[in-house]
Design a protein with these regions (language model features):
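N-terminal [4Fe-4S]-dependent radical SAM core
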Residues: 1-49, 53, 57-64
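Core AdoMet radical
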Residues: 57-76, 80-148
Length: 148
């Protein structure tokens, strides 16, 4: 079976892209949403060990900073859901290996999925096998990757 036939057998013909709300866009293909509906959360605040030129931690500055909060990720998301949020993007700065520290937050993410029903998208950087397995168990709605 050829590659395109395999893809068509297992996936629809549409691709859904996520515009995380850090910049406002409106085109015929992209509709704006209220920023409060889909909230971006940085697990590391503005800290990133890589500080790459394409970002320079600027993207992290527009996110809710979990690292400065006394709340758990679940508590923060509970409040956001009460305020009308329908989904979250979990991101943050990378460590020296390019990994965003999502693994310690997987128990909260599982609770968020089960108890709050929020859409969960992640920007994991370059996740290790354990993080990847946890995200698969969580059944995330999408993953964001850097294309440089």
């Amino acid at each position: 079976m050829m590659g395109m036939e395999i893809r068509r057998k297992h996936f629809p013909d549409t691709i859904r892209f996520h515009n995380p709300g850090l910049r406002r866009h409106r085109t015929s293909e992209i509709s704006c949403h209220q920023i409060e509906e889909f909230v971006s959360i940085s697990l590391t605040g503005t800290h990133c060990a890589l500080d790459c030129k394409h970002c320079g931690t600027n993207v992290l500055r527009g996110m809710n900073d979990l690292s400065r909060s006394s709340k758990s990720l679940f508590e923060l998301c509970s409040e956001l859901a009460e305020q009308g949020a329908r989904g979250i993007l979990i991101s943050g700065g990378s460590d020296r290996k390019g990994k965003v520290p999502i693994l310690p937050h997987l128990p909260d993410l599982i609770r968020i999925r089960r108890e709050l029903g929020l859409i969960i998208r992640v920007h994991p950087g370059l996740p290790d096998e354990e993080t990847s397995a946890g995200l698969a168990e969580l059944d995330i709605d999408g993953a964001m990757v850097d294309i440089i």
